[in-house]
């Protein structure tokens, strides 16, 4: 058994999986873009959203009312990124600002009716993708699924560069 050859095959399959994931996201984004165009016609606006922006909108929908800090924590991103995205979503008419009666300083976000519609569509397709993913694993034994879980966890925690490696640039990542 040639382990190096098998590892190379795994790398090629990994690259193909990433490519397929990009195509899958493209299909979902194309559908959501069509729905956005319909919402634009209804509301007289023009908005093109990235998947990250749609995920911020979805985070608001799942947790409203919610502030910038909480969104950033839940999405594992910076407050600056959330602030920039929320400004765009506010301008596009998908979010509105609110303040709680006991704290007039803190700004919270809620979805507008257009935001609720987009959130609902995103949630529906997210659930369908999850069902498809879960049913995919029906063909495997519990032991194989546990190995897949370990592999995915290791990829998430050990494969991608650390913050220190990223700060050092590509030469430090590929040394």
Swiss-Prot record:
It is found in: Cytoplasm. One of its GO terms (cellular component) is cytoplasm. PROSITE patterns: HTH_MARR_1, HTH_MARR_2. Keywords: Cytoplasm, DNA-binding, Transcription, Transcription regulation. Residues 10-157 form the HTH marR-type domain. The keyword Transcription regulation applies. Pfam families: MarR. One of its GO terms (molecular function) is DNA-binding transcription factor activity. Residues 68-91 bind DNA. One of its GO terms (biological process) is negative regulation of DNA-templated transcription. Signal peptide: none annotated. PANTHER family: HTH-TYPE TRANSCRIPTIONAL REGULATOR PCHR. This is Uncharacterized HTH-type transcriptional regulator YhjH. It comes from Bacillus subtilis (strain 168). The lineage of its organism: Bacteria, Bacillati, Bacillota, Bacilli, Bacillales.
